[in-house]
């Protein structure tokens, strides 16, 4: 609820920096908590350059699966029109390359989401990334992202 209140307040999101995000993210331990934190707070703050790339890269290097997931999910607002993003191939693909060997299901699913969101803005870059890195990426990521590029759906058999 706190994340939603901050997101809905006109000025509160503009006051978020590294210290505030650390405090608000303390104890995140489920996909729901992480995704709300990253989509509502961390990603938009990163998109607005209120926090440095080094903060998000630090999360990606964390031993905690939830912080690694938060790093990847924070790319969604960079690329989502609904979140105010205009597309950020560089930061998104940098995180994906950093975490491509991570086989934790929560991290792999977040990478799939990050790449599928970028594919809406820059399908050529995502296609090239898949071609170059498919051997290093989790199979789930390759399958879901390729499906998105080819059919527009993550799981085309589940309409």
Give the positions of each predicted feature.
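Alpha-helical scaffold domains
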Residues: 1-159
């Amino acid at each position: 609820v706190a994340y939603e209140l901050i997101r809905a307040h006109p000025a509160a999101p503009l006051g978020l920096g590294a210290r505030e995000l650390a405090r608000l993210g303390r104890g995140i331990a489920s996909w729901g908590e992480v995704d709300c934190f990253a989509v509502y707070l961390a990603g938009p703050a990163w998109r607005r350059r209120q926090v440095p790339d080094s903060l998000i890269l630090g999360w990606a290097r964390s031993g905690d699966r939830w912080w690694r997931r938060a790093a990847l999910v924070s790319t969604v607002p960079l690329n989502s029109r609904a979140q105010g993003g205009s597309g950020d191939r560089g930061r998104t693909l940098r995180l994906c390359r950093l975490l491509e060997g991570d086989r934790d299901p929560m991290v792999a699913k977040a990478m799939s989401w990050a790449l599928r969101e970028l594919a809406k803005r820059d399908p050529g870059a995502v296609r090239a990334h898949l071609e170059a890195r498919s051997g290093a990426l989790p199979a789930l990521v390759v399958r879901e992202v390729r499906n998105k590029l080819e059919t527009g759906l993550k799981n085309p058999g589940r309409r």
